[in-house]
Amino acid sequence: MTEGRCAQHPDGLDVQDVCDPDDPRLDDFRDLNSIDRRPDLPTGKALVIAEGVLVVQRMLASRFTPLALFGTDRRLAELKDDLAGVGAPYYRASADVMARVIGFHLNRGVLAAAGRVPEPSVAQVVAGARTVAVLEGVNDHENLGSIFRNAAGLSVDAVVFGTGCADPLYRRAVRVSMGHALLVPYARAADWPTELMTLKESGFRLLAMTPHGNACKLPEAIAAVSHERIALLVGAEGPGLTAAALRISDVRVRIPMSRGTDSLNVATAAALAFYERTRSGHHIGPGT
């Protein structure tokens, strides 16, 4: 491999071979585990990083347009059909060079970097939606990514963020979501918890998930609103939903538990609620 060589791939791809880990063309992929220099920090470059073939494919299918890709020759071969017509360069390097640039060995073998795009309003993402997940205080990126993956697989139409939520475009959230954080529509509430009232006025029934013993059991509560538009409210690990969010909700619902367990991981609890919604007749469409 010749350092700096630009190769016009047979499929018309812009493939550029890189052997020097200090090559400035790779700066958008540098120090991915750094606390203060990582390129996906909203206060820094604010890039969206896709990691692995499947997540890169989902980025290519999303509204986030890659600025560049960085990976091995093996991953290039796997992605060549997906990259047809993509104008971004593919910086081809060895696994060792990749590790020295990003700061660790990447088994998945390919990264893509995209810029952020303007986010829609809550009104825009819930227009036409029948099932919406509303998150409050979900500040763990892995939980957030899992919720997006669950939402995609279980026919949730959109995600709304209340106060205190993590960044859905953080690399770990995107990776754990398997790229669905780039595809499932989401919006951040500009006025919380007032926008919960806006959802109610738009025809949504607000179902607040809580471990409180006086709440309705989840299966019965979901079945009772099977023909209505619903917003499933999920709170932070530990404290759960705030008193204000619970007060505005229409129904408080709980997952029946056993063996003295009072609650489940927030992503698991959300998945159960999403699944109950599909069991009640809400359509599960073809996968992405």
Swiss-Prot record:
Signal sequence, renumbered to the chain: none
GO biological process, one term: RNA processing
Record carries keyword Cell membrane: no
Domain of life: Bacteria
Enzyme class: transferase
EC number: 2.1.1.-
This protein's record includes keyword Transmembrane helix: no
Pfam family, one: SpoU_methylase
Disordered: annotated span: 1-20
An MF annotation (GO) of this entry: RNA methyltransferase activity
Keywords annotated in UniProt: Methyltransferase, Transferase
UniProt biased composition (Basic and acidic residues): 1-12
Homology family: Belongs to the class IV-like SAM-binding methyltransferase superfamily. RNA methyltransferase TrmH family.
Name assigned to this protein: Uncharacterized tRNA/rRNA methyltransferase Rv0881
Naturally occurring in which organism (per UniProt): Mycobacterium tuberculosis (strain ATCC 25618 / H37Rv)
